């Protein structure tokens, strides 16, 4: 803790700062029965196992995300991600701690992506298309090049016969992938795109044929 927060202070000053702040925390976080959040000894600082509390970070870390099949439970976990880790926290001359914050943010963002991916998969498999599309839109803001997500979105649009939307989305995804990553979509995704592009062409031809039939002049 000293190396994170008071690395440039003298040893005596750093230890004093640590003792004072631990005392402040112990005094502030006390249950009705007198139990404090922290147990502090000469050599150890740890969380009191008898102290009852809820912590969003702990809940996110302890969840076995890949094994959760409850959409409601995953939605609850998603609701725990509120802003960045130590958001709006500015600490001067604490480079080690700032590096730790960045690492934790990266870790938590990856956990958030796992939650999104599980929700997308489960809502898709349960034909909850509106929810699935909503989760995909949010997920694409932090994971814009994921072809598995693009494939699910296209399959939903195909299922809805939304050929025009499917073509527009595929073209956007293709352009973004080529521009930002320098790669084309996988052969599987390109093959899938042929389905809705062919269907869109057929729909256009049918509309033209219908227009021609409707505009044939009547015989005298």
Language-model segment annotations:
Residues 2-134, 138-143, 147-148, 165, ...:
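Intrinsically disordered, low-complexity protein-interaction/activation regions
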Residues 85-91, 147-148, 175-188:
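Boundary/linker segments of alpha-helical solenoid repeat arrays
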Residues 158-183:
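TPR/TPR-like (Sel1-like) alpha-helical repeat modules
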Residues 179-210:
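Interdomain "pre-motor" coupling segment immediately N-terminal to P-loop NTPase/helicase cores
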Residues 21, 152, 169:
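Residues within the DNA-recognition helix of helix-turn-helix
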């Amino acid at each position: 803790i000293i190396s994170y927060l008071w690395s440039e202070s003298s040893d005596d000053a750093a230890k004093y700062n640590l003792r004072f702040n631990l005392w402040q925390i112990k005094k502030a976080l006390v249950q009705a029965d007198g139990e404090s959040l922290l147990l502090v000894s000469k050599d150890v600082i740890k969380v009191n196992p008898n102290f009852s509390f809820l912590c969003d970070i702990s809940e996110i870390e302890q969840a076995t995300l890949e094994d959760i099949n409850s959409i409601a439970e995953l939605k609850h976990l998603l609701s725990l991600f509120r802003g960045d880790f130590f958001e709006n926290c500015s600490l001067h001359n604490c480079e080690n701690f700032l590096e730790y914050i960045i690492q934790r943010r990266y870790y938590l963002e990856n956990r958030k992506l796992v939650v999104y991916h599980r929700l997308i998969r489960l809502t898709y498999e349960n034909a909850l298309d509106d929810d699935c599309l909503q989760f995909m839109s949010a997920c694409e803001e932090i994971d814009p090049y994921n072809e598995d997500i693009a494939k699910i979105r296209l399959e939903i649009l195909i299922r809805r016969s939304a050929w025009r939307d499917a073509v527009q989305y595929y073209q956007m995804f293709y352009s973004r992938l080529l521009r930002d990553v320098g790669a084309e979509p996988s052969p599987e995704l390109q093959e899938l795109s042929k389905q809705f592009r062919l269907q869109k062409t057929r729909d256009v031809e049918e509309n033209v044929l219908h227009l021609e039939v409707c505009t044939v002049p009547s015989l005298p």
